[in-house]
Structures are given as C-alpha cells and as structure tokens.
C-alpha cells in the first residue's frame, strides 16, 4: 500500500523533520513517572522498526523497582539520571527467544556468531531509536546510557539475564527540567560519499568542524569549555575501551565464531 501524497507532504512531514532535527540528550527530569499505557505505546511503536530477517533480537527491561534502579545507576555511573527519570530501561540483545523458537522445531540455533552479534546490535539500535522518536514526539526527553556496559556481568545478574542475552545500553526518559541546545553535527560532506570513499576531504572539513564545535562549547548556556571535536575523539579513542567485553560476551554464549 502506498502512502498518499497528503501524508508525506505538508505539516506532518515538516513536524517530523523538525522533531528529528531537534534531538538533544536530557539528563535532568522532574521525576514525574510515565504510565504503563505510555510505555506499552512506546514499545509497540519501537517494534515497527526494521529487523534483519525479522529476527526481532531485542528485549527491554523496564526498571520500576527502586533498589534495582539505584543499583543500575551505580553500576552505570549515572545515579542522578536514574533518580529523577520518569522511566528507566535496559535494552538488550536477545537470542534466547530465538533459541527457544529453534528448540520448538528440534533445532539448536547458531547464536554465537560474529554476524549474529552484529544483527542483534543493529536490531536493538533501530528498535531503541524508534522508541526514542516516539517518546520525543510525546514531549519527553531521553538519554542513552552506554555506561550500562561498564559492568555488564553485574547488570546481567541484577536483572537475571539468561544465556544468549546481553545488555547493550540503558535509557532514561522523562519530563525535562530543561532542554539543552542541539549539538552541531558533522557537515554532510564529511559523511556522504558519492560512488567511492573520499578521505582527502577530511583535511579541510575536520578543521572547519573543529571551529564550529569550539564555538558551540564556548557559547552554550551551561558547561562551557574549550574543546574541539577531533581532540576529544583522539583522547577518547587513544586506548581500548572496556577490554572485558569480549570475555563477557563469551560468558553469555557469544563466542564470535
């Protein structure tokens, strides 16, 4: 079924475009809790994201228990966010459900391949982004929390994650106490390549982007600093992050065959 021109043009298109272009992370919330009806609506919307071969390799833990929420905040080093958020969630790559599906037909699926890890990460990411867009369309703020990978073993034990399931990131949602400015992104020319990859353009595009980001960091309304994008990336990526992840994934049944 094709969508009508009236659907893809006009106010709906403009509002969607502006919503997507106005995203910024929110880390301070009023504490007002979101309803179960809202959570179900967001999950149903998230489920309409594309999924590789329709495996739907994702599960979400909605953290409503105060003690578990506090512990998740400690383990991910984001106590304040979880303390004020209206909803706290842990997004997981999930091949356990697929393993059960295979057993229903007398088959042991191959969950522990590098390809399937990539499939799972892609599925969860697409699912989560649909969740985020739906939440922001309702006026909520959100923040992805990669810190959930700081202590994946402890977090897995906290939420009783079985073999073939691992936490990818957490996410907070709620009514913002304030909204941050939108960070300038890389210029389109730096990410869009026509017909072949063009590395030469970075010699001019990256210094220009550094100037843009330096001005943004110096003039934003809070947490001003002197920094450039390339220097931050160099400092961040100069050493291996979370070297324990490979062994943790193996302990969950993903041995990268």
Task: Spell out what each predicted region is.
Residues 2-257:
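Acidic, surface-exposed loops and disordered segments
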């Amino acid at each position: 079924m094709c969508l009508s021109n009236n659907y893809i043009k006009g106010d709906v298109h403009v509002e969607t475009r502006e919503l997507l272009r106005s995203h910024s992370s929110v880390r301070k919330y009023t504490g007002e809790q979101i309803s179960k009806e809202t959570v179900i609506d967001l999950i149903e919307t998230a489920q309409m994201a594309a999924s590789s071969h329709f495996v739907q390799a994702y599960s979400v833990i909605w953290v409503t228990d105060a003690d578990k929420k506090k512990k998740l905040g400690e383990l991910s080093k984001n106590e304040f966010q979880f303390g004020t958020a209206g909803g706290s969630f842990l997004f997981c790559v999930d091949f356990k459900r697929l393993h059960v599906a295979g057993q229903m037909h007398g088959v042991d699926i191959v969950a522990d391949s590098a390809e399937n890890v990539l499939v799972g990460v892609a599925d969860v990411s697409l699912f989560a982004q649909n969740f985020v867009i739906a939440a922001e369309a309702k006026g909520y703020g959100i923040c992805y929390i990669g810190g959930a990978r700081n202590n994946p073993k402890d977090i897995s034990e906290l939420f009783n994650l079985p073999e073939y399931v691992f936490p990818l990131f957490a996410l907070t949602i709620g009514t913002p106490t304030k909204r941050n400015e939108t960070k300038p992104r890389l210029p389109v020319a730096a990410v869009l390549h026509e017909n072949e990859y063009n590395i030469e353009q970075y010699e001019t595009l990256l210094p220009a982007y550094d100037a843009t980001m330096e001005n943004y960091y110096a003039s934003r309304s809070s947490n001003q600093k002197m920094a450039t994008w390339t220097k931050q990336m160099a400092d961040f990526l100069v050493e291996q992050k979370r070297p324990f992840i490979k062994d943790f994934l193996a302990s969950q049944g993903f041995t990268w065959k």
